[in-house]
Structures are given as C-alpha cells and as structure tokens.
C-alpha cells in the first residue's frame, strides 16, 4: 500500500509555495503560476540552479522573473538514449530491448543523472544511471553511463511468466560518489548506490518505528523522520543515522498535531536548521548532534501537504504539494 501511495504522490505533484528563510515571519515569495499544468516529480539544487522535472519536461527557476522556464530538448533525450537506424544511442541495446528515462533527477559527486530502465524481450529489467549534461547555452546532452544491472529490480512470477520492474527511490541524496535513498522491496530499505563500483548495497535500518523520510545532514550522516504508529496519537522522532556504522541515534521528539506529522523536511547546514511543514504551518528548528532546539513556527502553510522533501535554495525553502483541487487556478505554480 505504501509503495502504491508513493507512486501516486509522485504523479500528483502540481502546486508549490516558496518561503523566504529570513528571521521573523515567513513571507511567501511565490505561490502559483497561471496556466501551468504539469506534475513535478523531482526538485534539486544543481550548482546555482534550482531544477524541477516532470516525466518529459525540465524547468529551471528564474529568480529575476519569479517563474519557471522550460529547458528545451528534455523530451528528446530518450531518442539520444536509444538512437535510431542512422545514429547510435548512448546505450548499447539488443534487438527487442525497450529503454526509457524516468522523470527524476539525481545529483551524485557534483554530477546530474537520470535513471534509465532497459527491459529485454523476456521482460527482464536492468538499470543505468545516465549523466545529464547542461551546456552554458542550456543545450542538453547525455554523458557517462553507470551500469547498475538488475540490483534495483524486483522479479515477480505470473504462472510460467516472470517479469521484473524497477523499485522507486525516495528522498535521494548523496555524499561523494554514493547515492542514498529509501526504497521498498519486500519491506522498506535504505539503499546505497556506489557509482564508482557500480554496486547497490542495502544498509542496516534498525529504528523503533517506521522511517518516513531521510535528508542529508553533514558528511556521512542522514536525518531520519521516524513515526511510531503504535502510539495513540502517533509520535515522531528525529534520528541521526551514521552511514559508516549503519546506526541510528535519537536526537529528540518532533511535535505532532493529533495524527498529523512533520513532512517536507530539509536541513540547511549553513544555518544549522531543519525546516518542515506541520498542520498548516512552516516550522524551523536548530539541530545538532547533541539534540534539538525549540521548534519555531514562522509562517502559515497554505497547502495541505508537502509531497516529498522540500529544498533550501539560497534564502528560499521550496515545497511541492498535491492539493491541486483546493487551490485556485490562478495560484498554480508547480
């Protein structure tokens, strides 16, 4: 059920609000953009750019105009991936292979990637991370290919037929040449994708509750939102996960509102603060390895739910939301 829900939420990302991080009450810098009708699946800060991607479109945020600008050529990258009768593609495909790129963006080792899935004529899948290059003039092309084989694939049987599909990666973040993400197999797992070795490792995930999301903290450490659904009402703990030791330590309890729990988390190392959304408000909190500061409510959140994590981009905290039906068309943003 959780796996299905995560896919539905990814397809539903449509609205957003951008919040200034200055001291005092929050100010909504942007909420909505007329006539915008796309479903944002991924947001990343890449160099000095804020990039947002849907299944077949790439957008960049323009601080001067306060608008999203579509990057030309994104939808044609699959042709570059597979090639045609006259031009070879980036991937070396066999007859009967089918390949496509998903709508997510990943940053590892300062490079930008997309995930390609290749399915052969027997229904067996494999994956490659393909570098996305953006030239100074905005032209897009594909670069190096990281072959992950079938390490991200789940195989199922239907009678005499077997088929495989790619598991989704939630809250992807990286340190060095390794990408970390939550992913459902038979259960929720924390995966480490080493691009140098082209390997995928499952890390130990031993916490008292259910991990809801992860976010990068400092080098080699992740923040984890952990909910305890056995409590009534539910309780939420912020944990610090040490990647090298594969251990999680509790930093402290996060506030909840009945069954509403924190979401849209993003940690800003420069400010030493965690930003999140809870019950119609935006919150911030000091975080150190010794514990948590007092949560501070610093603005109203006009959207009902932030799907996925937020991102900090300079002085802005950017969120995406799925409550399109509750927001007037004139306020639509992404």
Regions found by a protein language model. Give the residues of each.
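Positively charged n-region of N-terminal signal peptides that target proteins for export
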Residues: 1-8
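An edge-strand/N-cap motif at the start of beta-rich repeat modules
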Residues: 22-59, 64-66
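A short beta-strand motif characteristic of beta-propeller blades
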Residues: 26-34, 69-72, 78-81, 87-95, ...
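Repeated scaffold domains used in trafficking and secretory/extracellular systems
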Residues: 37-44, 90-107, 153-157, 164-173, ...
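Residue position within the beta-strands of beta-propeller blades
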Residues: 52, 114, 181, 224-226, ...
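Structural motif
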Residues: 57-60, 121-131, 187-191, 231-239, ...
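Short loop/turn segments that connect beta-strands within beta-propeller blades
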Residues: 62-66, 134-138, 194-198, 242-246, ...
């Amino acid at each position: 059920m959780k796996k299905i829900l995560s896919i539905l939420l990814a397809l539903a990302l449509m609205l957003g609000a951008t919040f200034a991080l200055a001291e005092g009450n929050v100010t909504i810098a942007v909420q909505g953009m007329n006539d915008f009708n796309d479903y944002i699946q991924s947001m990343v800060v890449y160099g000095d750019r804020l990039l947002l991607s849907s299944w077949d479109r790439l957008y960049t945020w323009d601080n001067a105009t306060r608008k999203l600008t579509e990057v030309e050529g994104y939808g044609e990258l699959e042709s570059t991936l597979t090639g045609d009768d006259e031009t070879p593609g980036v991937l070396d495909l066999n007859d009967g292979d089918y390949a496509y790129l998903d709508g997510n963006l990943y940053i590892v080792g300062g490079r930008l990637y997309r995930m390609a899935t290749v399915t052969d004529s027997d229904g067996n899948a494999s994956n490659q991370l393909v570098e996305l290059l953006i030239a100074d003039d905005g032209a897009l092309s594909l670069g190096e290919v990281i072959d992950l084989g079938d390490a991200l694939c789940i195989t199922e049987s239907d009678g005499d037929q077997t088929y495989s599909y790619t598991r989704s990666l939630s809250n992807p973040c990286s340190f060095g040449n390794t990408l970390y993400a939550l992913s459902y197999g038979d259960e929720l797992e924390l995966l480490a994708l080493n691009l140098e070795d082209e390997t995928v490792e499952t890390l130990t995930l031993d916490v008292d509750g259910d991990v809801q999301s992860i976010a990068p903290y400092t080098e080699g450490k992740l923040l984890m939102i952990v909910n305890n659904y056995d409590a009534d009402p539910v309780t939420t703990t912020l944990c610090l996960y040490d990647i090298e030791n594969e251990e999680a330590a509790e930093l402290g309890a996060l506030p909840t509102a009945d069954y509403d729990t924190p979401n849209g988390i993003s940690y800003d190392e420069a400010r030493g603060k965690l930003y999140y959304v809870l019950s119609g408000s935006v919150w911030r909190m000091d975080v150190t390895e010794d514990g948590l500061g007092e949560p501070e409510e610093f603005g109203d959140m006009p959207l009902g739910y932030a799907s996925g994590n937020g991102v900090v981009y300079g002085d802005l905290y950017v969120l995406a939301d799925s409550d399109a039906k509750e927001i007037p068309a004139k306020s639509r943003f992404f």
